[in-house]
Amino acid sequence: MYFAIRLSFVLAVLFCLTGNGSARMLDADRNRLQQLQIRSQQSTDANTQVDIAYEVIGIYDKYKGQGGSNVLREAQLNSQVNDFKRKTMVIDGVPAQGGVWGILGAIKKAADAVPDNVKKDAENLVKSSTKVLVRGIYDYLMGKMKQH
């Protein structure tokens, strides 16, 4: 009997500690998402935008598929994330299958042959597409995190 009481006490303490850790993690992720969203809106650098997007995707990966998920919206976001990753994946400094960095790299290599407005348009495309992705994931996760 004494053992059962001690065991239940230990389990209760562990349960409380785990619950608080989960709440702290949720708060930390929520705060980080807010910071990343602000940085995404303020940044004018394509590389920074891509870095922010990958960090937001990492947070999204932690929470997707959990209870209270909107299956249709997650399917749309998963499609956007996979498309983004496919276009921006870099392996050993080399873009996989060209992608966005292939376009930007080709533009940078042929900088003298490509008009400045075309280079600027390509960079603006990268920045705007990453901002849209970050905003979509941010809106979805913030709505989902409010439920907890």
UniProtKB/Swiss-Prot annotation:
Compartments where found: Secreted
InterPro entries in UniProt: Turandot
Segments crossing the lipid bilayer: none
Key words of the record: Immunity, Innate immunity, Secreted, Signal
A GO cellular component annotation in the UniProt record: extracellular space
GO biological process: cellular response to heat; cellular response to oxidative stress; cellular response to UV; innate immune response; response to bacterium; response to heat; response to oxidative stress; response to UV
Main location class: secreted
Top-level taxon of the source organism: Eukaryota
Signal peptide: 1-23
Key word Secreted present: yes
One Pfam family named in its UniProt record: Turandot
Similarity remark: Belongs to the Turandot family.
Task performed by this protein: A humoral factor that may play a role in stress tolerance.
Protein name as catalogued: Protein Turandot Z
